[in-house]
């Protein structure tokens, strides 16, 4: 018995104890079962605590180390985030210890980690799917647009200042950011198996390849296999998939191991020939065709999704109008209302549609004074006040709540050149 114990102890020295291998073995009709938890319980102590039983020999080995996997896209809003969350949950169900990663996010819908730091909401959802707490290493770089040409840069969960697009993409500090995101990935990879990575937008923006931090250059650093996600619902799926593959370097093209056709509507049999054609022209296998889903409610982070939302009042429901600001922030605040059957939630800056609302919501803004100026210029501010006099309820969140006051002041010019402006109150 002790000879077997010695051999098993030697064997365990070669295992990754963080995976907590379950061990069951027998010798001379004696069965001993033990669970080793990251070295917290010694094998000898665990064996002494268990009664002997007769039985068969079985050793449950740790799961193999997997390559990191990146979901890259033919464009924005093709479904990368949802598929990454799905894979995180599938790996968890299969006994692995996965974690999500996206090197750089551009979104106004952020999420606070347990430490009070900011990451993109998609990675927070993916972390929940993976069964792990969210951390800034999962999204080390977050860009929060403040205007058409500038954004607040959030590094490791903390704002480090505003940058213009040119400054951000073309300055020497870019390589420092690359080191930061690479180190964040390395820390995750040392703790989790596998890391499920997400690219950003399209992988075919060849004019930005030398400064790209999030797509194929990140996959190269991670030695990741890449799956290309193509959206068939918006049309042009063959051109977008083929173009995305063809525009890559030979080295990067080899990383793309498969294609997923997402958001398919109709009878899949009608696309069977399409699968074969795509495999022929791209030279890459199609791993699957995913139906268009209507019942998966995961908070969006991409403003592309906002453009698809309802825009008009309807009869027979409580009409709740969200004022469509140019720099609207955290539109996911209203998702629960969107799924309430009693409510028609719509986004608009049309004066006539605002006047039909029972409730008007002023949302958060990344540039509050600039958005308030625009509301006054286009007549929306006057329409909100008139709707309030007509009996509508007006509520504000964050920057929208500030707009409801008597005056907004920005003496230090944090958001722009306008130092103060009268509010709606």
Predicted features, each with a name:
Residues 2, 39-63:
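Domain-level recognition of soluble alpha/beta enzyme cores
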Residues 1, 127, 266-269, 406-425:
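Pocket-forming structural segment of enzyme catalytic cores
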Residues 27, 360-364, 384-407, 424:
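Catalytic nucleophile loop
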Residues 33-37, 86-90, 406:
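Active-site signature of alpha/beta-hydrolase-fold catalytic machinery across serine-
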Residues 1-8:
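Phosphate-handling substructures
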Residues 66-386, 393, 413:
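Flexible phosphate-sensing "switch/lid" loops adjacent to ATP/NTP-binding sites
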């Amino acid at each position: 018995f002790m000879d077997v114990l010695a051999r098993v102890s030697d064997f365990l020295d070669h295992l990754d104890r963080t995976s907590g291998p379950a061990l069951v073995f027998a010798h001379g009709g004696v069965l001993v079962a033990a669970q080793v938890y990251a070295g917290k319980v010694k094998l000898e102590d665990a064996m002494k605590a268990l009664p002997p039983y007769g039985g068969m020999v079985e050793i449950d080995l740790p799961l193999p180390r997997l390559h990191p996997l990146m979901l890259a896209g033919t464009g924005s809003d093709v479904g990368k985030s949802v598929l990454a969350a799905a894979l995180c949950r599938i790996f968890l169900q299969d006994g692995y210890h996965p974690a999500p990663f996206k090197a750089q996010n551009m979104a106004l819908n952020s999420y606070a980690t347990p430490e009070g730091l900011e990451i993109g909401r998609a990675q927070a959802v993916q972390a929940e799917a993976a069964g792990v707490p969210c951390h800034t290493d999962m999204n080390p770089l977050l860009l929060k647009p403040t205007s058409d040409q500038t954004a607040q840069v959030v590094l490791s969960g903390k704002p480090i200042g505003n940058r213009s697009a040119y400054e951000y993409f073309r300055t020497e500090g870019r390589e420092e950011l690359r080191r930061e995101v690479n180190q964040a990935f390395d820390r995750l990879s040392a703790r989790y198996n596998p890391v499920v990575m997400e690219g950003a937008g399209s992988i075919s923006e060849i004019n930005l390849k030398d400064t790209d931090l999030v797509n194929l250059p990140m996959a190269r650093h991670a030695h990741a296999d890449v799956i290309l996600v193509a959206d068939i619902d918006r049309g042009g799926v063959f051109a977008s998939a083929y173009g995305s593959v063809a525009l890559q370097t030979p080295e990067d093209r080899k990383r793309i191991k498969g294609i997923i056709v997402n958001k398919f509507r109709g009878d899949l049999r009608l696309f069977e020939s399409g699968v074969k054609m795509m495999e022929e022209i791209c030279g890459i296998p199609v791993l699957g065709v995913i139906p268009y889903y209507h019942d998966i409610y995961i908070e969006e982070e991409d403003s592309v999704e906002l453009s698809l939302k309802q825009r008009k009042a309807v009869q027979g429901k409580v009409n709740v109008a969200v004022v469509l600001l140019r720099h609207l922030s955290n539109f996911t605040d209203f998702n629960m209302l969107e799924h309430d059957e009693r409510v028609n939630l719509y986004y608009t800056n049309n004066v006539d549609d605002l006047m039909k609302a029972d409730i008007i919501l002023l949302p958060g803004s990344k540039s509050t004074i600039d958005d308030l100026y625009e509301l006054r210029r286009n007549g929306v501010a006057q329409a909100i006040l008139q709707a309030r006099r007509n009996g509508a309820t007006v509520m504000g969140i964050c920057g929208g709540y500030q707009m409801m006051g008597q005056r907004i002041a920005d003496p230090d010019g944090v958001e722009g050149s306008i130092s103060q402006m009268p509010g709606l109150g």
